[in-house]
Amino acid sequence: GSEMCIRDSYNSDGKYIINLDSDGMLEKNALVNMITRFENDTAINCMTGSILTVPEQIKKYKAGPSRLLRELEFMEYAQAFLAGRSYASELNSVYTLSGAFSAFRKSAVLKSWMYNTDTICEDTHITFQMRYLQKERVEVCEDALFFVDPIENVNKLYTQRQRWQRGSLEVSKMFMDKSFKVKNLFTNISVKTLLYDHTFAFPRPVSYTHLTLPTKA
């Protein structure tokens, strides 16, 4: 989907290219906030929005493990985008654009290899292109909010995190010759982020949820 949209952009007349997941929902001012950020800083060529789960949908679940899973997921997204990536944005160390909501200046995208379908994490691949090949800043627009449905169940959450892990490893391998090496653990933020994600961040909601589930006698 994303790859086809980017390729179709060759024939577009617009100044910006914005990718959105079809099953999410934009906050009413999200696009205005993002384009305003682009217009106010011509040095920015790619940004990710802030992704959150829909709070109203979380309240529909019965109190207990089911609701707790969705509450933990919401807090994880809030921490990742409104705190973690916002701070990383200031240091130009955002690991990946969000596949659910990201935006580019068309001029920057047309210099890239576009989305790569050899990996299941095309969003991470184009992020690495921007950072390592084109030397672009990758930033977060904190007030450009995009809401997604809460995860369906623990199995879906596990599958989602497994897919993210696999994708990040695939992309890392593709960029091993672009300073993405283990020897750069203490100097390259992407290496540190990869190691952290594969030890603490990705399994966190699954682990928290299992700790709260009642055990059989």
Set out the residue ranges of the language-model regions.
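Short aromatic/hydrophobic "clamp" motif used to bind/position activated sugar donors
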Residues: 17
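Acidic donor-diphosphate engagement hotspot in glycosyltransferases and nucleotidyltransferases
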Residues: 29-31
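Conserved small/polar residues in nucleotide/adenosyl-binding loops
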Residues: 1-9, 209-215
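Catalytic donor-sugar/metal-binding loop of nucleotide-sugar-dependent glycosyltransferases
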Residues: 129-146
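Basic/Trp-rich segment in TM-proximal cytosolic loops or flexible interdomain/linker regions
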Residues: 91-92, 152-211
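The conserved acidic donor/metal-binding loop of glycosyltransferases
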Residues: 21-25
